[in-house]
């Protein structure tokens, strides 16, 4: 009898959806990526490419849960922000996975937002400054933080700044990104 009850509970839970999720959509972002060290004498930054996809689970008009997967690729050109030569650098070549929550002002046409979460970065990270030296490959954790604006009648265009703090390699990877949200059928 217990086995039948366990099987019925498992089957019922497979068909029951989360009741607090009102809408689902997919957000795709592309942008210019930048990596900077936490501490630097020469004020260096490496430029590159950023790409990310998020599953948007809207709980209320002002709160969303967003699991994400993305990619960040930045390369140093050996120069500082004033275009002078520098021995310091910070580079990221990583696949990003994690989850974050977004709090937004539910305003039509223009809705400001902020989000925070936790995630993992899988790849190669190099930070070379006069204060620290890290050359790591593998899996490290990151803390994502973003803010920006959702634009349009249905707030389906996203313009924002997104940051990934990597404390274990003392660097910050960020991006100026533009995104498009595509509704999914329930």
What do these predicted ranges mean?
Residues 1-4, 19:
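Positively charged n-region of N-terminal signal peptides that target proteins for export
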Residues 3-14:
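Sec-dependent N-terminal signal peptides
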Residues 18-59, 64-65, 173-186:
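Short glycine/proline- and aromatic-enriched beta-strand/turn motifs that initiate or cap beta-hairpins
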Residues 21, 56-58, 102-108, 121, ...:
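Structural signature of outer-membrane beta-barrel channels/translocons
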Residues 28-32, 53, 65-69, 99, ...:
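Membrane-embedded beta-strand positions of outer-membrane beta-barrel proteins
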Residues 31-37, 70-74, 117-123, 162-166, ...:
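Outer-membrane beta-barrel pore domains and translocons
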Residues 34-44, 70-95, 122-141, 176:
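Flexible, solvent-exposed loop segments that connect beta-strands
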Residues 72-79, 141-186:
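Predominantly the C-terminal beta-signal and adjacent terminal strand-loop region
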């Amino acid at each position: 009898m217990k086995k039948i009850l366990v099987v019925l509970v498992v089957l019922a839970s497979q068909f029951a959806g989360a009741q607090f999720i009102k809408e689902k959509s997919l957000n795709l972002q592309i942008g210019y990526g930048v990596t900077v060290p936490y501490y630097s004498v020469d004020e260096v930054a490496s430029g590159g490419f950023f790409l990310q996809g998020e599953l948007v689970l809207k709980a209320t008009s002002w709160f969303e849960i967003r699991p994400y997967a993305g990619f960040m690729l930045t390369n140093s050109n050996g120069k500082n922000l004033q275009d002078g030569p520098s021995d310091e650098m910070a580079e990221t070549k990583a696949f990003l996975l994690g989850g974050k929550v977004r709090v937004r002002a539910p305003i039509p046409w223009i809705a400001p937002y902020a989000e925070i979460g936790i995630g993992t970065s899988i790849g190669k990270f190099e930070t070379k400054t006069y204060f620290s030296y890290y050359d790591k490959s593998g899996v490290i954790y990151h803390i994502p933080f973003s803010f920006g604006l959702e634009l349009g009648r249905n707030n389906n265009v996203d313009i924002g700044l997104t940051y990934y703090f990597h404390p274990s390699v003392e660097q910050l990877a960020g991006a100026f990104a533009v995104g498009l949200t595509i509704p999914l059928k329930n």
